[in-house]
Amino acid sequence: MVQGGLDAAIAAVTESGQPYATETRTIDGVDFVVFSNAPDNLRELYRQGLQHADRVFFVYQDERFTYQEAWEEAARVGNQLKHAGIKSGDRVGIALRNYPEWIFAFMGITSIGAVAVAMNAWWSGEEMVYGIEDSGLKLLFADEERIEGLRPYDDKLNIQTIAVRCQPEGYIPWDQFVENGSRLMPADPVPTDTNATILYTSGSTAHPKGVLSSHRAILNALMCWECGGAIGAYMFPQAAAAPTPLYLPATILTVPLFHVTGLVVQFLQSFKPGRKLVAMYKWDADEALGIIERERITSFNGVPTMAWELVQSSAFEKYDLSGLRSAGGGGAAMAPEHARQIDNKLGKGSAGTGWGMTETQGLATGIGGEAFLQRPRSCGRAVPPLVKVKVIDKEGRDLPADETGELCIWGVMNFREYWNQPEATRSTLVDGWVHTGDIGHMDQEGYVFITDREKDMVIRGGENIGCQEVEAVLYDHPAVVEVAVFGVPDERLGETLATVICVNPDEPVSEDELKAFALDRLAKFKVPDHFWIRTDRLPKIASEKIFKRGLRDEAIELLARTT
């Protein structure tokens, strides 16, 4: 389909009077395209779930909650928060595993206009204290692990904490907190530009930034994904007229709810279609396969390695996955061979990926089907009709197609500010554009290719080396499961390249073989000087991206011992 056909479809789907009609609004001094019919606030989104009131909404192990039950639990939370003195704009923290109470707490907090602070449940006690103090929490929901981590700081914090799934002395248990709460949802006014969430960046830096976003930003992001489906149906009516699916929509909650993928893409995107959300205690590919069969999962979204782990599992053939219609993820590039195998094993056209950030509600680009198989290294095109993507040089000037620079994202879904960090906000958010720090280019058709991070560039003897370029080559080796490439200090060259590689234990491979493989595909100076090969998976940060900083620190320590 030529670009003209896409433009015509966007115009038809978004014209005045249509469900996805758009208009221009000035927000914080910037003119944005917004959906005319977007819900006013997240409470109205939750109300949409009542159209499927008796349908199962959330599953955790042997616990099941309908949309009606979730609405009523959220109402109890909201009413009791008001009783505790929480007002619009107050920050309330959630520091839990992906328990049902996480969902109910978030719904209750945001339904009364308070700000839900999604605390990183993987933080240490000291890091938790940083988040609590930085955000200025008035109240905290925490489970046993988080409460124990905070105990050494009890005297310092003096914060009211609601204990979830535990009853430690001196804390109010969840059941007691909500016991007398009305099941009628509060009706407090929550204007669309009210602040809704603070999500902390993944924690790969010493001091994570709190990303503040409004109800409007989140709701427009959700509608943009919906609208993309409507545009596709307009362009390809035969595909849209396909037989009704065998099963109701259902997905797996594969990542923590404190991460934008878990919160927005998986949780909040479930209300409109009445999708079932099945939580796991922790990610495990074999367990996920069992859930896909048992719960009739229809879509799967996580980081790219998760879909790859599914199709590589020795148990893959044992399960009935016929209900699964799509599988993919974002947050990292997918190796071409991984994309092909996912598509072959899960059904033609099912594989896909996308790109987004906490600062953009996870929304920016998307790609799937045949387009993805043709361009597996691309993260797609800007999602219409709200998103724009551009590439700029170091002076901030726009670059033409196929030239490499910093990628920037524009749209109403962008965050409002970094909490308590005005300088970081000013440098990242400029005239409605988020300056991502991702390095890449767009081709002539608008497909985005991320080649590196600004901070992930290694300069070896004056030569710039993009780590993702080297990783992509190593991923093409059939024995390679995961790769991390990074720079380590070198007295002569300034930096040299190092890599830690997880390989398939059933396909042993030597350092010399991998070096030769890379040398056939890369300039010599781009081939890593240091290799560490292992069969254990590489460590991850909360967003499920590989924890490169930790691996680099370990590598530097090992090299210091041997020199």
Report each predicted region and the residues it spans.
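Conserved pre-ATP/AMP-binding loop-to-beta segment of ANL
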Residues: 182-200, 206-207, 242-250
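ANL superfamily adenylate-forming
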Residues: 23, 145-192, 219, 555, ...
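Conserved ATP/PPi-binding loop(s) of AMP-dependent carboxylate-activating enzymes
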Residues: 381-386, 397-428, 463-465
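Gly/Ser/Thr-rich phosphate-binding loop
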Residues: 272-273, 294-302, 311-374, 388
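Conserved AMP-binding/adenylation subdomain of ANL enzymes
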Residues: 219-253, 258-298, 313
